[in-house]
Every structure is written in structure tokens, then in C-alpha cells.
Curated annotation (Swiss-Prot):
This is D-aminoacyl-tRNA deacylase. A Gly-cisPro motif from one monomer fits into the active site of the other monomer to allow specific chiral rejection of L-amino acids. The gene is dtd. GO terms for biological process: D-amino acid catabolic process. A motif (Gly-cisPro motif, important for rejection of L-amino acids) lies at residues 137-138. InterPro entries: Daa-tRNA_deacyls_DTD (IPR003732), DTD-like_sf (IPR023509). Belongs to the DTD family. It comes from Thermotoga sp. (strain RQ2).
Length: 149
């Protein structure tokens, strides 16, 4: 599984002119599921995201997690994180999970974050979404359960 994690002061997702998920201070997490991913990948990613220390402590050092600051998480599915642009100029998405598997593991990831006590909002799986955010920092982190980066 891959994720782009952004520290935000606020974020929201709009589908067909309706806000389907919104948060204040916390993390916006774009999540892509690969064709070979398993629940173990979900567990690794949920643990990493929930414990990622990218919020500043009283000394201004990035030392606090989203849970430490009582922040919120907005999770948005994004299969395009598996876009392969090494050949040509049109991305190939053959490494992305098929929709049924992608949805199941995306929902498992959200469930695991909630089990960790986090307040989680979501986008809408397979919908065309407009994501509005205020990136705080900016701080943007890339995660990959295969540890490619």
C-alpha cells in the first residue's frame, strides 16, 4: 500500500457538490492499494500513519503524532499512486489492485485507524472527488508498505 500523508490545518472532500468528509487539524492521507497487498500491509500502514511524529511539540520539534495532538484523519482513496510512468507519457495502472480488493483493503485501513482511537473521515471510494486542503508547513510524507521509499 502507498500513502501520501499531508499535515493539514483543515481538509475536506466534495463529491457531486456535497461535502462527504471534513477535518480540522490533522492528517490528509491519500491511499493507494497495490495488486499484491494484504491485510498485513494495512496494519503496517495504519501503525505508521497513526504514530507518525510530524506535529511540533512545545520546543518546535516534530515530535508528536496525530493522536498526541487529538487531531483528525481524512482518508481518500487514490489508485493513481500506483501509476507507472517509466515508459511513455501515459501512466500504466497495472500494479494497482482491482476495485473490489482495493475497496476492501481501503476500508480495512480506515477501520484499523479507528481502532487506534483516531477520528477518521473519508472520501468516497471510486468517486470523482474534489479535495480541498490547507497544507500546514508544508509537510508531505510518502509511505510504501513494500518499503520502496
Amino acid at each position: 500500500m502507498r500513502a501520501v500523508v499531508q499535515r493539514v490545518s483543515e481538509a475536506r472532500v466534495v463529491v457531486e457538490e456535497e461535502t462527504v468528509g471534513a477535518i480540522g487539524k490533522g492528517l490528509l492521507v491519500f491511499v493507494g492499494v497495490g495488486k499484491d497487498d494484504t491485510e498485513e500491509d494495512c496494519e503496517w500502514l495504519a501503525d505508521k500513519v497513526s504514530g507518525l511524529r510530524i506535529f511540533e511539540d512545545e520546543d518546535g520539534k516534530m515530535n508528536l503524532s496525530v493522536k498526541d495532538i487529538n487531531g483528525e484523519v481524512l482518508v481518500v482513496s487514490q489508485f493513481t499512486l500506483y501509476g507507472d510512468c517509466r515508459r511513455g507519457k501515459r501512466p500504466s495502472f497495472t500494479e494497482a489492485a482491482p476495485p473490489d480488493k482495493g475497496k476492501a483493503l481501503y476500508e480495512k485501513f480506515v477501520e484499523l485507524l479507528r481502532e487506534k482511537g483516531l477520528k477518521v473521515e473519508t472520501g468516497k471510494f471510486r468517486a470523482h472527488m474534489h479535495v480541498h486542503l490547507v497544507n500546514d508547513g508544508p509537510v508531505t510524507i510518502l509511505l510504501d508498505s513494500s518499503k520502496l521509499f
